[in-house]
Amino acid sequence: RVAQANPKTGGIDPEEIRRVVDKDTCLLSVMYASNITGTIMDMEGIVRAAREINPDIYIVTDAVQHAPHAPMDVDKLGFDGVNFAPYKFFGTRGMGYGYVSDRVAKLPHRKVLQRPEEIWELGSPTPGNFAAMSAVVDYVCWLGGHFTKETDRRKLFLVGMEHIHLQERALLYTMLEGTDKAAGLRHIPGVHVYVDTEDLTHRDLIVAMGIDDVDMTKCVEEYQKRGVTVFERVNSSVYSKRIVEGVGLTGAIRVSPMHCHTVEDIEEYLRVTKELAEEFAK
């Protein structure tokens, strides 16, 4: 069974989870945030809705998109599994990380016979991958140290992630509304922000947009010629089809800056967007 996206928000509503989950449903898998619309799911509401129907249901979340943008409390939310990818926040490709709850850790699985039942590791991992991930954590803790006098690494990490989220929300607002030097996406003729919502507290720093009468691939190429990197997400891709069509589109241009971008970077992107919209309108 597949839960359908809300075309107005680009997310999955708890009510939709109630529709597809029953007392015999074993597993619910849900993305923490959409990598196309940037919508952060109401995970508390989704978990609560599922467990009201089946208290024993296993719930896992794909947090590849959301993990680099805000802290997650897996214990509070009651997840049984979480996965994320270090390449999304300056780490190495070729490796992913996961979390499993105590009850999942003890499920039957392939393991070295003499190891404890909750150990899933097989063989020797690549030290370089862990070194790269450790450097990411060091960086976030360094950021957190600018906003607190705490020395505990977990507290530093949480503060760092919270400020990353706030910084990105400010950049998202700038993209949408602009500055006195560059008009925002909401105010450029011929430009459309898809699945746009006023409440930015439930959005990661991602915008799905389009320009009137312009092929997505052609538009991406024109951005690249001007030094701006964006990507097309179209329904011909198996990775994009469900959510793109779920919000009533055939494709969108995905714009996804990060906290380290500046207001000046956003202004340059907005100026290029306005320039392209005017050129294509001729």
Where does each model-flagged region fall?
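Pyridoxal 5′-phosphate
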Residues: 1-282
